[in-house]
């Protein structure tokens, strides 16, 4: 037995401003022939596809028909789907965190997690103290969630110094303005001081609440007592 099939892919850039049609032909799961509208003719991927490529390229009418499919197939279907898929916009959720909880001035990987967004075209940039980082950036690329939304991780390799501010900036068609999320590099002592301050504040609130509770309870008890020593 054998398996022979083909696929048609429409690639859109900036709406329908630029459209690329890619038709791929397979034999037993191996691609042997393709038509690329950017090339304008059939090209053999393996020797098995060479006879078909030569045959179809020698037929001007058939070749012109495949070139026109950019409009008759791709742009035509885009206009149909435009009513549902293209206008759909889902804003991304952005979070920033380090992969390791370790002292500063050690190699670390900062992660900018961008999730649950649609469409898939998105731009994620890293900044350190307001200056864009161009090197040390690793990305997972787009990952499909299976519900018409996407996610991606864009990581920055760095050695954080105390006081530095790292910013992940995300631009997406669903956003009127870029979203920025900051991560501030703090020493262990600074983190401990901050946690102590927060803990003291919470403890103070607890004591205040307990004091108010006792005060109002006593006030209620006193208001319920009957006056004594009055002559009738």
From Swiss-Prot:
For this entry, the protein name equals H-2 class II histocompatibility antigen, E-S beta chain
Entry membrane topology: Single-pass type I membrane protein
Taxonomically, the superkingdom here is Eukaryota
Q: Mind telling me which residue stretches traverse the membrane in this protein?
A: 194-216
Q: For this protein, what post-translational modification is recorded in UniProt? A: Ubiquitinated in immature dendritic cells leading to down-regulation of MHC class II.
Please give an example of a GO cellular component term from this record.
MHC class II protein complex
Disulfide connectivity for this sequence is: 10-74, 112-168
Question: Which keywords does this Swiss-Prot/TrEMBL entry list?
Answer: Adaptive immunity, Disulfide bond, Glycoprotein, Immunity, Membrane, MHC II, Transmembrane, Transmembrane helix, Ubl conjugation
Kindly list the places in or outside the cell where this protein is found, as annotated in its UniProt entry. Answer: Membrane
